[in-house]
Amino acid sequence: MNETKTIDVLDVKGKKAGSAELPGDLFDVNTNIPLIHQVVVAQLAAARQGTHATKTRGQVSGGGKKPWRQKGTGRARQGSTRAPQWVGGGTVHGPQPRSYAQRTPKKMVGAALRGALSDMARDNRIFVVTSLVDGDKPSTKQAKAVLSGLAELRKVLVVLDRSDEIDWLSVRNLSEVHVLAADQLNTYDVVNARTIVFSQAGLDAFVGARSANTQALSAQPEVPETNVADQHPYGEDSFRGDNPPAGFDIKGNEDSMKFHEPSSPWYGRTIAEVWFRSAAAAEAAGFVNAVKSDSEKEDAK
């Protein structure tokens, strides 16, 4: 899997005009059929208008008058001629406007498309052409002849670059052909097609865009450079961070400007904001020994 496949690029006469590579990460991956089914169902559901609507008894006009009195007629009691059991009445629990869209993560959509394309590539149902028309004018007749020379002209998906106006105009009127821009390629149209025909520019645009997206997802965030002054705020004998170097075992608290030595009874409960190499370095930075300062306060009392 993930092997790059090389196929021939054909000209309008059906002759080889070069070769094109189908990257393995796009055209040779495992095909996850349940995933493709889920994405296609979501895509078709999102295409539904969802504008269906029925009227309830409160929305149907009329029916404000009670049709007959409550008692004495021998008939069943009725309160309105627009009740659901009446002809012309409202509908109970009828369809209302709603959205059928389903949330589908981008990674799932991309994986389904790659799987569908890989299945087509393994069946040799993907073709690449330089162009569908030889000339500067659109020609549906010539485009149809080119496509017929590749495979059966039935459910053909043509993928073009957006700037390829001549080819676009040449095939858009063919009932057997569905044409898309490279950035419009989707799982449903790939699954629904029997053959996919890329123009050279369309394939380059599709592969280029997908490769850029893949690189953006896989790129690791750059680790910001740590400022030396931030690591050593009080000189070389101080260190700010969670993993102090060996020998930095004096804990300093910048809020109280006190430091704790390992022999301090509060050493284990103290969260170090700054580490010092020695007590002298902490005192030089303006910190005082927490144990001595507390004992001096008790003596003063």
From Swiss-Prot:
One of its GO terms (cellular component) is ribosome. The keyword Ribosomal protein applies. Disulfide bonds: none annotated. Residues 224-301 are annotated as: Unknown. One of its GO terms (biological process) is translation. Residues 1-223 are annotated as: Large ribosomal subunit protein uL4. The keyword Ribonucleoprotein applies. Pfam families: Ribosomal_L4 (PF00573). Residues 49-105 are annotated as: Disordered. It comes from the Bacteria. One of the primary rRNA binding proteins, this protein initially binds near the 5'-end of the 23S rRNA. It is important during the early stages of 50S assembly. It makes multiple contacts with different domains of the 23S rRNA in the assembled 50S subunit and ribosome. Forms part of the polypeptide exit tunnel. Part of the 50S ribosomal subunit. Belongs to the universal ribosomal protein uL4 family. This is Large ribosomal subunit protein uL4. It comes from Cutibacterium acnes (strain DSM 16379 / KPA171202). The gene is rplD.
